[in-house]
């Protein structure tokens, strides 16, 4: 993996090296996996990846905010957001890796 960002191409290459499928098959596998996660979230379902974390769609209610340009109050519309909460296993792994 190059740099500090893991990309789809990096995932495909890692699967190719680990599993030995063709790069094209690995790309299809990664794309299908990400599509399944996205489709579940579109339906409002929770995606739990054991040992990794939980992706969840949450509803945020309307609230009063502020226009950053003018400083005047402005209503922020209700919306849906995607949240991610890392599992305890993932948190511990990151703490060990970062010397925490």
UniProtKB/Swiss-Prot annotation:
Pfam families: Bac_DNA_binding. InterPro entries: Hist_DNA-bd, Histone-like_DNA-bd_CS, IHF-like_DNA-bd_dom_sf, IHF_alpha. Transmembrane segments: none annotated. It comes from the Bacteria. GO terms for biological process: DNA recombination; positive regulation of metabolic process; regulation of DNA-templated transcription; regulation of translation. GO terms for cellular component: cytosol. One of its GO terms (molecular function) is DNA binding. Keywords: DNA recombination, DNA-binding, Transcription, Transcription regulation, Translation regulation. Heterodimer of an alpha and a beta chain. This protein is one of the two subunits of integration host factor, a specific DNA-binding protein that functions in genetic recombination as well as in transcriptional and translational control. PANTHER family: DNA-BINDING PROTEIN HU (PTHR33175), INTEGRATION HOST FACTOR SUBUNIT ALPHA (PTHR33175:SF2). NCBIfam families: himA, PRK00285.1. Belongs to the bacterial histone-like protein family. This is Integration host factor subunit alpha. It comes from Caulobacter sp. (strain K31).
